[in-house]
Amino acid sequence: MANHEQIIEAIKEMSVLELNDLVKAIEEEFGVTAAAPVAVAGAAGGADAAAEKTEFDVELTSAGSSKIKVVKAVKEATGLGLKDAKELVDGAPKVIKEALPKEEAEKLKEQLEEVGATVELK
């Protein structure tokens, strides 16, 4: 069995993609998540802090009049192929991306709205 130093050295040599895969494998193997715990700010603000949503789904509700630009923006944002991005846009309302942090979700919403799409954060 490898000692701690050998494990740390092996991790240092990994690429970001390999580290991401390692984290996912550890999460699956041990039934845990690598998400940082959210601290609740005392009893008075506790209910508000717990109720605040931290992850959002970006839903395309309509492609609007410039469908081609929306398809290109969806393709770029999701990494899908052109055909898959077009099918996603044609099937609106559809969730484009799930469980994004608030800033990322708002940025994607802005990008899609700039090209004429109607978008909701859920």
From Swiss-Prot:
Xref: Gene3D superfamilies? 3.30.1390.10, Single helix bin (1.20.5.710)
Q: Which GO terms describe its molecular function?
A: mRNA binding; structural constituent of ribosome
Keyword Ribonucleoprotein tagged: yes
- Which terms under GO biological process does the entry name? translation
A Pfam short name: Ribosomal_L12_N
Q: Does the keyword Ribonucleoprotein apply?
A: yes
CC terms in the record's Gene Ontology section: cytosolic large ribosomal subunit
Keyword annotations of the record:
Ribonucleoprotein, Ribosomal protein
Q: What does this protein do?
A: Forms part of the ribosomal stalk which helps the ribosome interact with GTP-bound translation factors. Is thus essential for accurate translation.
- Which family would the database say this protein is a member of? Belongs to the bacterial ribosomal protein bL12 family.
Complex formation: Homodimer. Part of the ribosomal stalk of the 50S ribosomal subunit. Forms a multimeric L10(L12)X complex, where L10 forms an elongated spine to which 2 to 4 L12 dimers bind in a sequential fashion. Binds GTP-bound translation factors.
Q: What is this protein called?
A: Large ribosomal subunit protein bL12
Organism placement in taxonomy: Bacteria, Bacillati, Bacillota, Bacilli, Bacillales
